[in-house]
Structure formats: structure tokens, C-alpha cells
Amino acid sequence: MSRVVITGVSGTIANRLEINDFVKNDKFFSLYIQALQVMSSVPPQENVRSFFQIGGIHGLPYTPWDGITGDQPFDPNTQWGGYCTHGSVLFPTWHRPYVLLYEQILHKHVQDIAATYTTSDKAAWVQAAANLRQPYWDWAANAVPPDQVIVSKKVTITGSNGHKVEVDNPLYHYKFHPIDSSFPRPYSEWPTTLRQPNSSRPNATDNVAKLRNVLRASQENITSNTYSMLTRVHTWKAFSNHTVGDGGSTSNSLEAIHDGIHVDVGGGGHMGDPAVAAFDPIFFLHHCNVDRLLSLWAAINPGVWVSPGDSEDGTFILPPEAPVDVSTPLTPFSNTETTFWASGGITDTTKLGYTYPEFNGLDLGNAQAVKAAIGNIVNRLYGASVFSGFAAATSAIGAGSVASLAADVPLEKAPAPAPEAAAQPPVPAPAHVEPAVRAVSVHAAAAQPHAEPPVHVSAGGHPSPHGFYDWTARIEFKKYEFGSSFSVLLFLGPVPEDPEQWLVSPNFVGAHHAFVNSAAGHCANCRSQGNVVVEGFVHLTKYISEHAGLRSLNPEVVEPYLTNELHWRVLKADGSVGQLESLEVSVYGTPMNLPVGAMFPVPGNRRHFHGITHGRVGGSRHAIV
């Protein structure tokens, strides 16, 4: 039997577009919806290219996909049953060919559908099909997806005869046909995927209002996490996965941020559990953005790629704690009939048939120019999350001018992409994107240059008069203590008594999440040992500067405030309250400066403030010095 060989879309190199822009393009959206309908209706147990079998690569039903098995028999008592690599240095790169597989199969359906159009502009539909790529959901800029993803059970598209038609929306959920016998409760009783379900009963439904509220409340936390990761994490170990990092930063890993999106979207539903998350159609919008952030981070850190590590809990192929590196096969994704993709072969997305709008118009052969241009865009997109600290610390500016300050950040001089970035071809190969997507959102506008203001830096690594202290809470716990997904929520100010109000409280600052397989009987040894420790960070500075009413961000002002006002709670995915014995919440202050010509704020040595949480349940275990 021949393998499914993953090459990406051949012929052209085209942009993957942000979902808010994508849905505005009638041809793209109409073709995408129809293709997803076809994928979702393919008999799941009979075709490795069906939506169900592609989703099943990630987790359940823990069976071989495309006949790919390991050298040793899979042992459900010692290793994770899906192929996906979580808690591993391979996390970012394993998901790249996974999204590529999905895109490749989807694109074949898109082309077949475009060929059926009988309209006078059929050639335009065929061209749109050639240019269509999997869209991404940039939750760091827009945490609440458009209605076409989370609200509308039906959508209006243009059919093959050119007429508008209302159809069932395959982005809203996936309907199992049938529910797989491997699914545990409550998934075994739900005929469709659910997001933030209103109960665990068989008649549960999506709670769209709660989903929106949770994502909206998490926006600032997600944005600041993303900016900090892109600008302050410079080693692959700290960037790639949610296990305890290299100890040098106060920033979350890509995987940790990704975990939070899963838990926020899913709650007690499918996206909140790695065993069944990939069956929710939003999964690939989410992971396409994870892939985009991998591209942005790699551009800002040229030459840094996969470093050696281990497989943590293992996979369907890899035993637990097996050594992995840049050459480890990314199973089950074949690049030929006899070999698999490895991390070293997927650094250049243009060779895989796609790019992202941020890279349009750039000379990809000039790493330093690309670094400067991408840094420029990252500042525009997400920089306000950190530059509010400068605003709060600079009386001449004031905390109310965060947006204008972010626009005045000094940038390294480099050619910026053109204003219509989403329409420009990447270098070296052209990407032909329809004019309908040219008036594209913040991602294109982010490339605009701006004047450079004067900034003064003091000696000794302390903040200058135009610098500030950046305040961060570090959260550490054992990943498997509960055996299911959960969140540690941080508040500045009183915590509501009703847990239903926690995530929408005005005092909620942010959270760190555990994205945990809850399927009993699989990876039982990992779950029973419960000794995998993960860490995450919640950035406090923006909230303090905008809500605390303090005169500065210096330690003598902020430390007593945090001692009195910082609180935390543990919330399980099913909405129940938890007591996490392994929890340790501690606080760091990091002096930040913005030297003239620097691309990003420059952190000094972080300083522990153990006294803020020491002596409290779940607080710092370190003695106050």
C-alpha cells in the first residue's frame, strides 16, 4: 500500500490569510466551506484522508494512521497514544507537516469544486482555488474569532451556478458518523464537537456567550504573552515547549500559549482535551497560527532551530523520554514513500507551497533584513502589551497613551514590507493572491515605519527615566496532578465568590493552563506518576499601569501592592474548583530599557520578590532574603 506523501500545495506559493480577512473573500470562503464539507462527509473509518482520520492522528482513537507503526509495540500503560509531540522540543515542528497534510488534502477538494463552476467567471474561481491556503486565526490580535467560526450554524456561500445558497457550516462543529467506540465519557455521548459546553450531559450544547466572554477576557494576557515570547525568548528549549525552560526569561513558550487557547476554547469540550481536540474544525485555524508564530520567531532568531531534548511522555511511535533532535522523524508524516519529514527539512515554508503576509516583499536570502522587518511588524501588532509600562513610567506620556507610544517605538532601520503586504509576492517565488484580499487588516498595516524618539539609558542595568520594571508572576505545577485540563487564574483585587464569574471579573489578569489528556487507561504510568513539572508566566505590568493607580512601577511601590492584591484560584476544565498541591506562584521584577536603535525593549537581570507570595497556600516556597 502506498503512503500518503506530504508535499504541500504544488504550483504556486501563496499566502495563508488571517481568518477575519479570509471570510471576506467570497471565492475563498465559498470554496473552503464546500471542501470542508466534503472532507467531513468522507466515511471516517475507510479513508485516511477523511476529516476524522486526520483528526485522529493527534490523539484518539490511538490506532495507526496510514499504516505507520513504531519498531516496538505501542504500550498504552507507558506512552501517550497519539502521534503528537507535546512537552517536547519537537512540538512546533511536528505540527508543521500536520497542518500541511490538512492543507494539501483540503486544497485537492477545493480544486475539484472550482472545476464544477459554470459561471462566466469560472477562470477566476479556478485561480482562487490555486491560491487558497489554510487560514490562520491570530488570537494574539483577535482573540474572538469571526461569527463564521463560532456563532453561525449556517453560512451563505456562492454555489457552482453563481447563486447564493445557505449551507450547514462545517466550521461550527464536526459531526461524528458514528461516534468512535474508543471515546470516553462525555465525548462518547456527544454527537458533535462542543466548545465551552454548558454541561457534561448527553444533551449538552455550546455556550457561545461564555466562549466569547472567556476569549475577550483573555485578550490582553494572550497578546502580552505572544509579544514577550517573540521578543524575549532566544533559545529553542525555552521557546518550544511548556516544560520548565532554561531559567533565563519570564516569558511563556509557544506551547504554553497554545495550551491556553485550547483550554479557553474548549473548556470541558473537545478542544480542551488533547485526545479529541483535533476533531474540532477550529483546531487547524489555531495550529496554523502556531505555525505562523514559529515562522515569525525563527525570523527574529535566525540560525536557532531544534535543539536536542527528549520525548517526555512519548507518542504512538516514540517511547517515553527517548532522545529527540532535529533529525528525529516527524511520524506519521511521509515526505517520500520510504522516509518521513524531519525538523531540518521544514525550515523554509516557500518550499512547502505557502508563506504568511508578514514575509511578502522581503528578500528571504537576507536574514538580518528579514529579522528587522519582522521585528518591525511584531512591534506594530503586539507591542502595546509591553509599551504600556513605558507609558506608565513616563509622566510626560501617561498611561492613557499606550497606543501612541507603541507606534513611536524605535525600530532597527531596514526595508519594510509594502503597505499592501498581503497582496505582495514573497521572495524569491511569487504568490498570486486575489485583489479581493488587498485591503487587509492590521497585519498589513503593521509594517508602516515611524520616527524614532530619544531614549536615555542608565548604567548598571536599572531602568532609565524612560524605562520601567516589568512585573511577572511565575506559575509552576505538576501537569498530571488532576488527570485532566485545568487553569491557574490570577487576580489583582478581590476575587468573586462565584467561580462562574472568575474569567469575566474585571480583576482577572491572566491564567496559565494545563492541557491534559483525560482518557483513562492511556499513558497510565505518566498520569499516575504525575511528576512532569510545567511552568508558565502571567504578565502583570499592563494591568498594574492601567488599573492600580500607582505613581510608578518601581519595587518600593509595586511590591506592597502585589502583596495585598495578588490572588490566585484553580479552575478545572469542567468548571469545578481545584486545590493544586504542587502549585507555586512567585513574582519577578525585571528592569526594562529601550536603548536608541534597539528593535525591542532590553531586559536586565530579573529579580525575585518571594515575599509577595511566601507563606501563602500555593505561594513561593523560597525563604525571604
UniProtKB/Swiss-Prot annotation:
Query: What PROSITE patterns would the database entry show?
Result: TYROSINASE_1, TYROSINASE_2
GO BP, sorted A to Z: melanin biosynthetic process
Family indicated by similarity? Belongs to the tyrosinase family.
Question: Quick check: keyword Metal-binding in the entry?
Answer: yes
Q: What range does the record give for the signal peptide?
A: none
Q: What is this protein called?
A: Tyrosinase
Q: Can you state the subunit structure given in the record?
A: Monomer.
Q: Propeptide residue numbers?
A: 388-625
Residues noted as binding Cu cation A in the record, renumbered to the chain:
58, 86, 95
Q: Which UniProt keywords apply?
A: Copper, Melanin biosynthesis, Metal-binding, Monooxygenase, Oxidoreductase
Q: What is the role of the protein in this entry?
A: This is a copper-containing oxidase that functions in the formation of pigments such as melanins and other polyphenolic compounds.
Give the catalytic activity: 2 L-dopa + O2 = 2 L-dopaquinone + 2 H2O; L-tyrosine + O2 = L-dopaquinone + H2O
- For this protein, what is the EC number? 1.14.18.1
